[in-house]
Amino acid sequence: MLVRSRYIEKIRPFVGLDVVKVITGIRRSGKSVLLQQIQDEIAQNVDPAGVFVRINLEEEENSRFLSKGVVHAHVLNIAKKSRDRKVYVFLDEVHDMEDWEITVNSLRAKKNVDVYITGSNSKLLSGELASCLTGRYVDIQVTPFSFAEFCEAYNADGKRGDDEVFRKYLALGGMPFITNLAFREDIAGSYLEDVFSSILLKDVARRGKIRDVDLLGRIVRYVMTEAGHTFSAASIVRYLKKEKRPCTVDTVLNYLDLCEQAFLFARVKREDLIGRRILAVDEKFYVTDHGMRRFLVGGDAMRDIDQMLENLVYFELVRRGWHVTIGKIRSKEVDFVAERNGEINYYQVTYLMPSKETRNREFGALLEIPDNHPKFVLSMDPVDMSADGITHLNVRDFLMQESK
């Protein structure tokens, strides 16, 4: 089993502190396994004498814990018997529990209780939790495997990021259960389609009280097809009208918000790099698991390769803690403006640069930016084409770098 070290390192400083540790992310991205790994880390290296309570609220045998107050009473009973020993509470998919916010906050306030929860909806951290915890939580967002993690899981012989592994990653995506399927493409598609259906029904339609699931599915597939391209809700409405499925812009916007909350995809805003202001139109969406997109949209692993490389780079930047926008510099576009703790990096992403014209296009937008922050062009070209103060990197090499 692959240890998700990056996330454990993020959690470790908060173990035992008076904050709820909240792990969020798309369904089946490995939150439950990470929760177990955190428990193992505490038991082995932090507090071997600790008492551990683990409840998965999606499992049928734990259905009694969904009722108001049952988890609270159960944990307090264990804490009372534990005397001076710390009780570590791990609640999986906590949003299914009645009045979970009150229970979690009450347990957090107990001196000898340390609380960890998971959820598959970003709204877990909005009004629901924030109003109760008033800042007493830390959020760790989990994504499917990065390319580096995929290589570690895939390679028994120690190969790192070669052509075969990268093609597999492009084809299958990073959902951790793919490892249990021996990375077989012939059966991975069925699994990913089932995961998609589960997300659509449980995390989007049910939560948003959506009855027209067919319309929802059409909108999601449109977004997945256009991942990495700018488009508007109005363009989706026009597309649906041609498909004889008319709907309003407000409906599309509502459905997109719900899908974003369920981590199906991420919305990225555009930024004017001259006036340094966020633009209100033409956002982009990136798909949380590109393997799921491939099996839903169709085609082989190289279909829409420019879009998918951009997709990979976006999520890698997010994993590394960067806040990412799309840059606009006059009539040109910069794929990513990444900001972190006062640092700014600029990135252009493309498949290959076989001609001078292509190189001029990719480097040209970066050259117009009137500052001296680091600038990068990422492509699959094996030859270093760095020029004019702009660093060129191979995409695979970038994805395999230590977090920077």
Predicted features along the sequence, with ranges:
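Pre-Walker A adenine-sensing motif
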Residues: L2-G16
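Hydrophobic anchor at the beta1->P-loop junction of P-loop NTPases
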Residues: I23
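Conserved lysine of the Walker
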Residues: K31
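Hydrophobic positions on the alpha1 helix immediately C-terminal to the Walker A/P-loop
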Residues: L34, I38
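Conserved catalytic segments around the Walker B and adjacent sensor/switch elements
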Residues: Q44-E59
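Short glycine-rich substrate-engagement loop in P-loop NTPases that contacts/grips substrate
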Residues: I55-D84
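Interdomain motor-coupling "hinge/lid" segment immediately C-terminal to the ATP-binding subdomain
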Residues: S120-S122, G127-T230
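Accessory nucleic acid-recognition modules appended to NTPase machines
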Residues: F183-E343
